[in-house]
Amino acid sequence: MENCFDSKKYLDVVIQTIKDKAEKTKGKLYVEISWKLLEDDFAQRILPGYDTDNKKKMIIELKRELDILMCVNASAIIENLPMTKKAIPCVQHLEHTLKRIETVTGIKPHLVITNINPEEMYDIIYNIEISFQKKWYKVWELYMKKWFPYNKSFLLSENGFWNDDHIPIMKKIALITGIGNGNWKLSTCIWQIYQDHEIGLESSYVMFQTFPIYGLPPEHPINQAWAKRRDCETLSLDDFGETTEEGAQQSFNIIKDLLWDVVEDDNLIKHYEKASDMIICPTLECIENLEEVEKLAKKELEE
């Protein structure tokens, strides 16, 4: 099949955009990966020419400036919930994913265990932490926050964010990824930006994703096929007439609510007027044959 997607252009734009945003950030730049870190089987199916190693190449290109944080919810670990289509237990999947990231990228990820209830979970979580520390992983704790993200006064107090570990990011950029639902990737970014600010580091946030495509309407076959793949993620038009998905819109609202009054005026966050402003997604500009991609997306919807 003829290539419909310029993978080199896509990779170049993503890398340069991340570098540009990092240069505009005085502290650390936290880059949330909205889907899987290393592969995207959906993109491969509907974007002929999409390089399966795109994200790997991006990470390797930025390697000297990059740390990776892997987030997982404490409840998923304790219950050892099944992950992936093969129902691999959480702890086993976590071990495999961490090892694979390190093997593929040469970067040893930090492990961030989130949503810990210390009154009920601490002994079990402590033992899990020890097992990963014996494999030379740095392990960090984020505690349960009741009524997050609505209890702003509590979150911005000594009993809120300051109870969590402040992860010492040594590089300029931190990629934030995770496994399982409710992994608290966004929360991890917010905790870090807030705590960085309190010690004089003016850090910021962006999200990196391949889909949905904001320059196409919600009902476009490409966006609908992606929504089906993500189990009916809600797509709609925002106040600016751009496609937005529910998760990204919620993230945008939370970031603006919790960090707007914290960060300085020249922070990237202060310049985000809509969800798409905080998202790196050059997919549309790299599609060379939109008609053919539409056909593949429609086929995906029919299956």
List where the protein language model places each region:
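Flexible phosphate-sensing "switch/lid" loops adjacent to ATP/NTP-binding sites
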Residues: 1-175, 192-303
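Residues at the beta-strand->loop junction immediately N-terminal to the Walker
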Residues: 177-179
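Walker A (P-loop) phosphate-binding loop of P-loop NTPases
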Residues: 181-183
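Hydrophobic positions on the alpha1 helix immediately C-terminal to the Walker A/P-loop
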Residues: 187-188
